[in-house]
From Swiss-Prot:
EC number: 1.1.1.37
Keywords for this protein: NAD, Oxidoreductase, Tricarboxylic acid cycle
The keyword DNA-binding appears for this protein: no
Physiological role: Catalyzes the reversible oxidation of malate to oxaloacetate.
Keyword Oxidoreductase in record: yes
Molecular function as annotated in GO: L-malate dehydrogenase (NAD+) activity
Protein name per Swiss-Prot or TrEMBL: Malate dehydrogenase
Top-rank lineage group of the source organism: Bacteria
Recorded family membership: Belongs to the LDH/MDH superfamily. MDH type 2 family.
Top EC category: oxidoreductase
Organism field: Thermoleophilum album
GO biological process: tricarboxylic acid cycle
Reactions listed under catalytic activity: (S)-malate + NAD(+) = oxaloacetate + NADH + H(+)
Amino acid sequence: MSILPLVHAMANVRGDIEYLTEA
């Protein structure tokens, strides 16, 4: 079982949060 999909999802969520807090 690979954790890469989980890491990728977490990175996407973090990017969304940074984008929202920037606006």
